[in-house]
Amino acid sequence: GCHVNGLVAHENGSQPDSLWVARRARTKPTYPGKLDHLVAGGLGHGEQPGENVLKECAEEASIPREVAIQARPASIVQCCKADETRWGVKQETLFCYDLLLPCDFKPVAADGEVESFELWEIPQVIDSLAADNDDWKPNVALVIIDMLIRRGFLAPEDDGYVELVRALRR
């Protein structure tokens, strides 16, 4: 699937300091009410990640195409998840994009999959992930941790950094 980190830098030209966070609709059959990316969606057979990002940006958060085309491929995260329908484990490849959004941008849920959007400061995101309280959709947490490492919000001096990077890159 494709995941978009919707980032905001409140000082022009600076490192982003905030991340848009979605709360999934409580009516969703999978991970209802969990915290999620601004935009994320499954990748259909033969569908290109970049086109999927543009489609999902419009469908999930009403992001205009002229803004969505600024999403940049940033990383790939691979993980496994339990798959009850196939009696085992499913390998996931997550295409990670970063999208720097204007300070005055406000996402609007367009497809009923999102209950609300909130703009969180990066330290709040880190604290929430570190609390390990099951608030986040699991694969979303992995993609956000990847972004925090890539952008230097987490550093080798932080407790558990090496173990975290090692686990993420397995």
Q: What does each of the following model-derived ranges do?
A:
Residues 1-15:
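Acidic, metal-coordinating catalytic segment for phosphate/diphosphate chemistry
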Residues 3, 18, 116:
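Conserved beta-strand and immediately adjacent loop positions that scaffold enzyme active sites
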Residues 15-59, 63, 73-80, 102, ...:
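Conserved Nudix-box catalytic region and its N-terminal flanking loop in Nudix hydrolases
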Residues 27, 31, 82-84, 90-170:
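Nudix hydrolase/Nudix homology domain
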Residues 66-74, 107-111:
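Short acidic alpha-helical/loop segments enriched in Asp/Glu that coordinate divalent cations
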Residues 4, 57, 97:
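Terminal peptide-recognition signature
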